[in-house]
Each structure stands twice: as C-alpha cells, then as structure tokens.
Regions:
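Core beta-strand elements of the Rossmann-like FAD/NAD(P) dinucleotide-binding domain
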Residues: 3-5, 196-205
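N-terminal Rossmann-like FAD-binding beta1-loop-alpha1 element of flavoenzymes
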Residues: 5-32
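Active-site substrate-recognition segment that forms the wall
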Residues: 21-25, 86-90, 200, 205, ...
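Glycine-rich FAD pyrophosphate-binding loop
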Residues: 25-50
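Dinucleotide-binding Rossmann-like beta1-alpha1 core, especially the glycine-rich loop
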Residues: 53-134, 262-263
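Flavin (FAD/FMN) cofactor-binding and adjacent substrate-gating region
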Residues: 80, 100-173, 177-178, 183-188
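Conserved beta-strand-loop-beta-strand element in the redox core of flavoprotein oxidoreductases
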Residues: 183-200
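C-terminal catalytic lobe of FAD-dependent flavoproteins
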Residues: 310-397
C-alpha cells in the first residue's frame, strides 16, 4: 500500500512548523500533525506547546560558534518570513547582556564581548556609568558591565512565528492535521503515525518535533534521552503611559555571580488581551519531570509560588521605577539534550527521525533548526555546513 504522504512532521511548534515550511518548499506530499493551542489551559487534558506566548529574546551573539551560527542564519530569514506570510513577529529593540565586570572570577561578560568581536557584530560595551546613562530605568549592582547589541536583536513572538511558518507551509502545499500523535512506528516499509483521535497516517519518513512531550513512553520504540524541566514565568502589567516611558527598553539577560539570581527579561509587549506586560524568567532551581503525564499536569498550573516570589523580588530590584504593578505567572518547560545541542537524527529506523532537545535557548534559532530537520529527511543526513557538532540523537535503553 502506498504511503499517505512523503514526509510527516509530528509537532506544530516552533521547530516543527519551521521544518514543515522548509520541506513543503522543496517537495510535495508534506503533512504536519499537532493540535491547536487550547482555549483553557487549566482544563485541557492534552499536550501543550511552549510557544503559547508573545515574547522570546533574540540575539546574534553567542560564545558558542554553533549556537551563534544557528541564531544568525535564522534571524537573517525573519524579514523573508514576515514578508511572505504578512505576519509580523520580530521587534528589533536590541538586547543587553549584563554581569560582573570583566577581570573577576565570572567571565560571562568577557566571553560575550569576545564572541561579538569574533563574529564582527557591532556592540556597545558599557560600565556602571554607561549602563545608568543609556538605560536609566534599570538598576544594576555596582561593579556591573554590559554588552549591548543594538541591531539584529530584540524579541520575537513565538506564537506569531509559528502562525507565519504554518501559513507558509500550507501555502506551499503542506496539509495541517489538527490531531495528537500517540505513536510512531516503522511498519511494512512505512512510517506510521497513530493519533489520539483514532486515525493512522503513513509516510516514507516521519520527523518528531514535539519538544518536552517527546519523552512520552510509547511515542517512539525507545524514548529520547533528555531532561525536561518546568519553568515559571512572571508577567507584570504596565499601563500605556508606562509602556511608552519604557519604549527604549531592550531585551535583557542579567547574569549574577552565584547564578541563582540570573534572569532574562522582555520589555513591555502587547499581548492578545490588549494589555502590555513585562515578562521575566529564571527559576532559582530545577523542577524535573520524568513522565509526560507529569508534564501535562504542570502545564495546567500557573507555575510555582516559590519561583514567582523569587522573580518578583528581582523585578523590583531591576526596575524600581515601576511601582508594584499587577502580576501573574504561567508555566513553561525546557528540554535539555545530553550534548547541549538540538538532537537532529534518526532513531534505530531510517524512516523515523527526531528534532528535539533545544536546551532552552532555541526559539530565536528555530527556523535554522527546522531547516536542518528538513534536510535530514530530504538528504538522509545533515550536510556539512560549518557546524562543529553532528546534532546526534540519544535514546533511552
């Protein structure tokens, strides 16, 4: 029996939608399987996505050459994706990275500054006085130093980027199947996907791109080897006037000596409810999940009170001029691979591949990561394109 499709992508998040677009641009017979965003998280019993949000930091500088290449190649295509889809998702407001000044035990700022020079990226290096003069709304610890990237950096809306990628995949001929995959198997010379809705779909090859939910016990013959952590993010509502006053605020990564108080923060962003929120994240410790059931239950919550209290304190220390705004929290998740890089490779079957384990830092790089996943299916391997890592996939015994 002939397969229903040439290639199926399982997962309609940032990586899956990107892979579907790149595949559909190059061949016919593409499908992407995954449910829509639930209307009510608290009562939803299915899977979730970490892209249900409006703010992720994007920047081109990274001390790691491979991560820098993934980011730069993705960012270079933002304008094309926005133009072709008609959906805007990128705000080039710049990105500021701060930490203890160079010369001490913490070398984070030094590594970022060196990476910027190596990559030829224009930056401003700011000491205490420079930080205060350029960003008066921030209050940093004495002895801080910052690397400011004014261009090619800022933030993206993951929700709108996924919408844009999905639209372009459909325009190129991909079929969107709004169902939830339960299992992927190599059967009789085909890759077969069975869904929770009771249907089966077959293809020459299948690419799994379901983020943290890829740890589901029966999804693959052997589950992927990665650690999945719950994260709590906190949102502070600001008025129109406050948002205007903070219009010069860049995306921020603040690194502290002991790392416990290290955070990331997004400037005021308008959310679907019409209000502006400043988002901050950076849990004080890890909350690991061993099963998909635990992960589903986590996404139905609003996160942890412990993390919220931690982030509220840091927010008021960093932005003292915003006086006790209303706030709320939400849950998210990140997945870490053994290698520290995305896993883009085949299972024991040459018909079933994975695109998972994005290490909490891949939203900005999702288009290039998705392209590499598409290349894996089309060419049978990732071609040598300047990456030092082989993006190898790991599986549990």
């Amino acid at each position: 029996m002939a397969a229903d499709f040439r290639f199926i992508v399982v997962g309609r998040g940032m990586m899956g939608a990107a892979a579907a677009r790149h595949l559909a641009r190059q061949t016919d017979g593409i499908a992407v399987i995954g449910p829509d965003e639930p209307e009510d998280r608290a009562s939803h019993q299915g899977v979730f996505g970490s892209h249900y949000d409006e703010g992720r930091i994007t920047r081109t500088i990274d001390p790691n050459t491979d991560w820098a290449r993934l980011a730069n190649r993705s960012i270079s295509r933002y304008a094309e994706i926005e133009r072709d889809s008609g959906i805007e998702f990128y705000a080039a407001v710049g990105c500021l990275v701060t930490g203890p000044k160079r010369g001490g035990e913490n070398d984070y700022v030094a590594n970022v500054a060196d990476a910027a020079q190596r990559l030829g990226i224009e930056t401003d290096l700011l000491d205490d006085a420079g930080l205060k003069a350029k960003f008066p709304f921030f209050s940093f610890s004495s002895g801080s130093e910052g690397v400011y990237e004014p261009r090619g950096a800022g933030h993206i809306s993951p929700r709108r980027l996924v919408k844009a990628q999905s639209l372009l995949a459909e325009k190129a001929g991909a079929r969107v199947i709004k169902q939830t995959a339960l299992s992927i198997r190599d059967e009789a010379g085909r890759a077969v996907v069975t869904t929770a809705e009771g249907e089966t779909f077959s293809a020459e090859k299948v690419l799994l791109a379901t983020g943290g939910f890829s740890i589901a016990e029966n999804l693959l013959q052997k589950p992927v080897e990665m650690k999945v952590y719950g994260r709590t993010v906190t949102f502070f509502e600001v008025s129109e006037a406050e948002a205007e006053a903070l219009s010069g605020m860049p995306s921020l990564i603040s690194v502290k000596p002991d790392d416990v108080d290290s955070i990331y923060m997004l400037p005021p962003i308008r959310y679907p409810d019409g209000k502006h929120y400043i988002k901050i994240g950076g849990d004080p410790d890890d909350l690991e999940f061993e099963t998909e059931a635990e992960l589903r239950a986590w996404f139905r919550t609003a996160g942890r009170d412990k993390a919220r209290e931690h982030l509220v304190r840091i927010f008021h220390e960093l932005v003292p001029g915003v006086k006790r705004p209303p706030s709320f929290t939400n849950s998210c998740a990140v997945s870490y691979s053994p290698s520290g890089y995305p896993m883009i490779g085949y299972t024991s079957s040459s018909r079933v591949a994975v695109l998972v384990g994005c290490n909490g830092t891949s939203a900005k790089s999702s288009d290039e990561i998705g392209r590499l996943g598409a290349e894996l299916l089309l060419a049978g391997r990732i071609k040598d394109e300047g990456y030092a890592t082989d993006f190898s996939a790991h599986f549990r015994d």
